[in-house]
Amino acid sequence: MELSATGVPKTIDNDVGDPEFRLIDHTPGYGSAARYWSCIVQNVNEENRGMSVSESVAVLQAMGRKSGWIPAASRLADPERLMPLQMYFAEGGHTLESLAENVNRELQRSGRCIVVVSEGFDVGGLGEMHDGFGHIEYGASRNTVAQAVVN
C-alpha cells in the first residue's frame, strides 16, 4: 500500500519559511489572527477614548516571541492612521526607555495612547519570570511593559 503525505505548517505567528518569503508568504492561521487583532485594537480604541486622564494608556501584548507579524497586523485597525497607536516588535530594536519616551510624546500630542507590544519585546531583566526549567515566561512582558509605561 502506497501512502503519500503532505505537511502544511499552521502557525498564527507567520514565521515559518525562508527569510525572503519565497516559499511561504502567509501561513494558515495568520489571517484570522491578523483580523482578530484588528478588531481588538478597534475596540480598545473606543474604550481608550472614554478612559479618564489617569488611565489614558492602554497596553496590549500580542503573541510573537521573535517575530512581529501579529503586532504589525494591529495597524489594519487604523489604515488612515488616526488612532494614537504604537507597535513594538521583538525584532524592532526599541528599548523600554524609547517606548516610554514615545508614549509620553503621544500623550502630549493627543492625550492618550494605545501600545501593542510583542511578547518577546526586550524589557531587560525587569520583572523577568522563569518556569520550572529556567526558561523565560514571555507572557510576563505584558505586565512589565504595562507597569513601566503607565507608571
Please report, for each region that a protein language model flagged, where it lies by residue:
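Glycine-rich, charge-decorated loop segments at or immediately adjacent to ligand/cofactor-binding or catalytic sites
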Residues: 13-21
